[in-house]
Amino acid sequence: MKIYEIDGNKYRLPNELTDFQLQMYIHLINWKWAHLTQESGFFKNSPYDALLPDELKLQGYPLYRPIKERFLEHQQRFPFKSHKFLGHMASSQAACANLFLPLLEDPLVAAKVLVAVKTDLKSIATDHLDRGFRIEFWD
């Protein structure tokens, strides 16, 4: 763990970060401090500001509040493990769920948005999987 002092704030972060990672961590931690808590989480008994404290992790953070129940329903229907670091502000699993679950609630809107990435997309096969999507594949 390394303490970075930036703009008068002290950030407890991993020892080695690229410039991009450092910028992203600072952004995510500043958001966490402004909207959730200034309390750190711990990894191997060391405090890290990008980790959420256990109390918030148990409440399902950093999942976006309006999709938390949808995430849990999806996880029951298609069993998958929550990542070990789901309680990290830079969690890829949380980012994916926070981005795609709200979008995929409406397959027509989702198709219109996703066609920008997959130009030959016509529609989403809503009769398959969970309205045509699945967050994780473990089978």
Question: Which sequence ranges carry the predicted segments?
Answer:
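Nuclease-adjacent, charged terminal/linker segments that flank catalytic cores
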Residues: M1-W138
